[in-house]
Amino acid sequence: MKKILFLSLFLMVCTILSAQKRVKVACVGNSITYGYTLPNPATDSYPSQLQQLLGETYEVGNFGKSGATLLNKGHRPYMQQEEFKKAIAFAGDIVVIHLGINDTDPRDWPNYRDSFVKDYLALIDSFRVANPKCHIIIARLTPIADRHPRFESGTRDWHGEIQQSIETIAKYAGVQLMDFHEPLYPYPYLLPDAVHPNVEGAGILAKTVYSAITGDFGGLHLSELYTDNMVLQHGEPLAIRGKANAGEKVTVSIAKQKLTAKAASNGDWAVTIQPLKAGGPYTLTVSAGKQKQTFNNVLAGEVWLCSGQSNMEFYLSWSKTAKRDIPQAANDQIRLFDMKARWRTDAVEWDTSVLDSLNHLQYYKDTEWTVCS
């Protein structure tokens, strides 16, 4: 009996300690944070999806208020809402703020724009008072699509002005800046009503916040343009850039040059190599942590970008002199990165799978640099 009682008490203490160790994340915002227009905000909103990504060691609170403005003289000031009071009481260890979309309303920004920075700083200070050790992340605004009824009557321009203000606030307040705009901007279908993300869009926001909190950006990543047989521009300083987990040391080596960089809080890193002498072949290596990517048979030379219409796709094998010309084409000093369309733009109906791929910007087939032959 004593053993059972001791075990029960032990498990109870472990449970309490476990609960105390959970990192609290307060998601502060408007209807986009709340999950307005989603089938089930309780499971589909970005804070709910963020909870799934972070796991049981985190507790994510959704304090989104539909229609809320950042401006304290706006038509629905966030700091006057019940959600704000609950967010303060929550005293999050991490506070994620996405406000400003509703401030593009003609009732707000034209009249009270000069108070935006002051009011945002006051909001930040409120959370710092509630938890002096909290880490605050503020987000650049999600896009507003051109289908919005007020897009060309001020909303587009005011949206841009607010973005600039948010960037200024991040620097002045010493808080982490996160981008909610770039991940959604290329995909209009993610914003069915021009403002609110669908479930997939909310998932992208959740992943963005997850990376901002954990620094996990999926490890070392470079553009698809980096492959074996590639050509780098010779004779001038050249930037090599990519993604890595935040804070990770990245090392780039080529032609007896070895450069290092530290991935920023958004995962971006870049180094600038000194001008390469024309020729090669060179070997380019990029490493971060336990990951390493090696690109062989790299040349330094002239890089030409060619784009155009159907005549750019004309195959040499289609020409009348193909049999004579093709044998003369072999030249290992010439390389081609040929991006071929996945689907023809002929007068045919595409099925839904094609439309889905196009919506995800999958226009071209996977390719790599090849040696001319």
Task: Write out the residue ranges for each language-model feature.
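C-terminal catalytic domains of large/alpha subunits in multi-subunit enzymes
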Residues: 327-344, 348-361
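Alpha-helical cap/lid subdomain in secreted, periplasmic
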Residues: 20-21, 52, 78-216
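Proline/serine/threonine-rich low-complexity linkers at boundaries of modular beta-sandwich domains
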Residues: 217-222
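Structural beta-strand segments of beta-rich domains
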Residues: 228, 236-240
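Bacterial Sec-dependent N-terminal signal peptides
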Residues: 1-21
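A conserved hydrophobic secondary-structure block that centers on an alpha-helix together
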Residues: 357-373
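Extended acidic/polar, glycine-enriched regions
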Residues: 241-321
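Conserved SGNH/GDSL esterase-like catalytic core that processes O-acyl groups on lipids
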Residues: 21-27, 32-121, 157, 276, ...
